[in-house]
Amino acid sequence: MFLKYILASGICLVSLLSSTNAAPRHLYVKRYPVIYNASNITEVSNSTTVPPPPFVNTTAPNGTCLGNYNEYLPSGYYNATDRPKIHFTPSSGFMNDPNGLVYTGGVYHMFFQYSPKTLTAGEVHWGHTVSKDLIHWENYPIAIYPDEHENGVLSLPFSGSAVVDVHNSSGLFSNDTIPEERIVLIYTDHWTGVAERQAIAYTTDGGYTFKKYSGNPVLDINSLQFRDPKVIWDFDANRWVMIVAMSQNYGIAFYSSYDLIHWTELSVFSTSGYLGLQYECPGMARVPVEGTDEYKWVLFISINPGAPLGGSVVQYFVGDWNGTNFVPDDGQTRFVDLGKDFYASALYHSSSANADVIGVGWASNWQYTNQAPTQVFRSAMTVARKFTLRDVPQNPMTNLTSLIQTPLNVSLLRDETLFTAPVINSSSSLSGSPITLPSNTAFEFNVTLSINYTEGCTTGYCLGRIIIDSDDPYRLQSISVDVDFAASTLVINRAKAQMGWFNSLFTPSFANDIYIYGNVTLYGIVDNGLLELYVNNGEKTYTNDFFFLQGATPGQISFAAFQGVSFNNVTVTPLKTIWNC
């Protein structure tokens, strides 16, 4: 998270939140107002504590819901037109990196960097939400608060990860805590101008509240740029491994431990790939190779700023882990997502050696996230994605082992299909004809593009174009996707998706070369202000924010075919909201 660089540079950020370290961490509020902006959210009451509830308990009286800051939310709160309907967003405040993704006891926990009282990155906490299907989320109380030191100076819980200490290697749990509930959070204790150190917290109530370890920090190398620990279990070495960023030294350090408390350095993977200003939010996983019984290790590194499109991006390396070192297969830099708005991706921890590799990314960019024109919240997460590896053609002579991403469980949200067409070509009356979408509703589209090469093919004209217009009366706002067969290029244009709001770094249009070795499949998830595009069954992905004028949402989609290009097997399907209030 770029905030870390700002704070480490000594720039003071003003926060509205006073010390919360002494306050109980599981509280209800006394009442709620009609919420129009973040400052109207009712303060948390210090007078009434609530015992840890069972799963599915966060519906408050009179049809309201519980927010991420323990506030009651009025019915219809999540229906605001500037809020995505199927992507997780905080009830209020500012959210960035996903943290501590862990699956245990049939429940997916997702923690996240959270500034609950401001709409810009500030006094970071660990927010918390849970799901049984990676689609529908319930808000839980804040898991980790800042620590207050002398003279009111705060140290902040920066990004990290979570594990299930099934065998109680840490000794933090009693026999009364069942193994599946022994969740340990590993995070960076960021003390501005002093140090970044790794610390842990643990739960004794199944993951509802957390207590900081009294012996923190568990790893301190006397550095101001040492953060974002990802801890995994090495099944071959039978020990814990921490992957942590030595951010401005461009290093990813590996440490081992048998108890999550005492750590020994193993190696450093350094100065590889795209550098940017700094490394952040590393991760590593053993990923299956499609069509085989083989696995390869993948090392993820976020960089910011310094992305090819500017700002934030996540790169990865394919290789092997020998228990001490990560050894890449090649020096090729690969990017997880080629859009403008994907950063700080995190992977789910599971106690199973052969569990699916599942991850989530922060759908924003530090170049403009603090100015995004949303009213009571800022930022969203991508839908959960399953990762595999596949040999993907790069040109007629070379394949490259590449990450394949598949969105998970979106099918649970599908409504009745709105539109189907077996083919749309340039001579079809359907080419360019608008399809009206339900108001304030997410939707998906699925299409295969093909080209008749017997016809002339000219760059800029031999293409298929998908246009998503807003529902404002004049259709002045839109976002579009072009597949140009002559140029072997995919173009995303969001120049008309920032009306009423302007940021010079909000790249209006960008193109990416794609090697077209046959038909091109496109699967898109379009939510209020967010597009996730998956090309050729996840060989490439593009995550992009867009901002229509306040009150406007996607209202039409059209498929325009030019010069020998055809859209085949076209479907458009609305998606039901994930929220019940």
From Swiss-Prot:
Statement: the UniProt record of this protein carries the keyword Ribonucleoprotein: no
Active site residues per record: D97
GO cellular component: cytoplasm; extracellular region
GO molecular function annotation: beta-fructofuranosidase activity; sucrose alpha-glucosidase activity
Reaction(s) the record says it catalyses: Hydrolysis of terminal non-reducing beta-D-fructofuranoside residues in beta-D-fructofuranosides
Enzyme Commission designation: 3.2.1.26
Protein name: Invertase
Enzyme class: hydrolase
Similarity field: Belongs to the glycosyl hydrolase 32 family.
Residues listed as glycosylation sites in the UniProt record: 37, 40, 46, 57, 62, 79, 168, 175, 322, 399, 409, 425, 446, 452, 519, 569
An annotated GO BP: sucrose catabolic process
Record SMART domains: Glyco_32
Signal peptide: 1-22
Positions annotated to bind substrate: F94, M95, N96, D97, Q113, F158, S159, R227, D228, E280, W366
Any Pfam family matching the protein: Glyco_hydro_32N
Keyword Signal found: yes
Record keywords, A-Z: Glycoprotein, Glycosidase, Hydrolase, Signal
Gene3D superfamilies found in the cross-reference section: Exo-inulinase, domain 1, Glycosyl hydrolase domain, family 43
Maturation and modification: Glycosylated; contains 67% carbohydrates. This is composed of equimolar amounts of mannose and galactose. There is also a small amount of glucosamine present.
